[in-house]
């Protein structure tokens, strides 16, 4: 369980823009927190967008009486569309504490308004804080839930639908190999699954329900997560909790 409390001196436009990014992190977000939306794409403009995040830090450990410098993130990503209904993203981590990794590599199809079909290497749709990019994080490091319970990325297929024109609800379901990013040749009889419901009740309050089911060996593990966010008078409040069972 973790909680977040943020303050701002007034409800300026800049603050509201930041809050909107924090609340609206979901399956349709690209590297800079904006959305790839079919209705906003220009039919004749296929020029890719380039994004990047660089995060360096210095740490001191009182227990060890030692310190270190680190490049925690040096991300580079390319997003764009090849058709009004087809978008793509490729993201590379050049330095994750000295390691290079391929992060996102997917194609997204938007056949009708509100519907998004994504195939490839993606972040699992579980936990709001898990879905945040480094430049949107509320702390210097990931929360306990993200670092200990959420298997961040995998290869699979997700389907998401945003019914905001009818009801303020978004739904995303995903199925994944369950082997992580670098072991994609194994034939699978059991997959990992995630489900996510986002309730955007009003501009002051929203919450989400999350479910993840994985089977790394012979035991299936199910995780249930709920997150809530509130914004009023320049204050951002956020809380998230998780419960785990074994079958």
Tell where the protein language model's regions lie, with residue ranges.
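Outer membrane beta-barrel
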Residues: 39-180, 189-191, 198-206
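Detector for outer-membrane/organellar transmembrane beta-barrel domains
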Residues: 188, 198-247
């Amino acid at each position: 369980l973790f909680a977040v409390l943020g303050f701002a001196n007034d409800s300026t436009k800049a603050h509201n823009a930041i809050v909107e990014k924090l609340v609206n992190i979901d399956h349709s977000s690209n590297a800079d927190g904006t959305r790839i939306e079919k209705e906003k794409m220009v039919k004749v403009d296929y020029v890719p967008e380039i994004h990047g995040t660089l995060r360096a830090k210095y740490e001191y450990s009182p227990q060890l009486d030692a310190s270190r410098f680190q490049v925690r993130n040096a991300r580079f990503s390319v997003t764009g569309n090849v058709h009004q209904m087809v978008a793509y993203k490729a993201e590379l981590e050049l330095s994750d504490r000295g390691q290079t990794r391929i992060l996102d590599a997917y194609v997204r199809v938007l056949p009708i308004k509100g519907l998004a079909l994504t195939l490839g290497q993606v972040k699992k749709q579980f936990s709001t804080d898990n879905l945040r990019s480094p430049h949107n994080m509320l702390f210097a490091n990931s929360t306990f839930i993200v670092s200990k319970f959420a298997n961040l990325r995998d290869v699979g297929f997700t389907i998401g639908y945003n019914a905001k024109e009818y009801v303020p609800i978004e739904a995303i379901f995903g199925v994944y190999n369950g082997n992580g990013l670098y072991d994609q040749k194994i034939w699978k009889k059991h997959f990992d699954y995630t489900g996510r419901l986002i309730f955007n009740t009003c501009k002051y309050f929203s919450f989400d329900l999350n479910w993840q089911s994985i089977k790394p060996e012979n035991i299936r593990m199910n995780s249930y997560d709920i997150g809530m966010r509130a914004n009023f008078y320049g204050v951002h409040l956020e809380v998230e909790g998780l419960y785990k069972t074994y079958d």
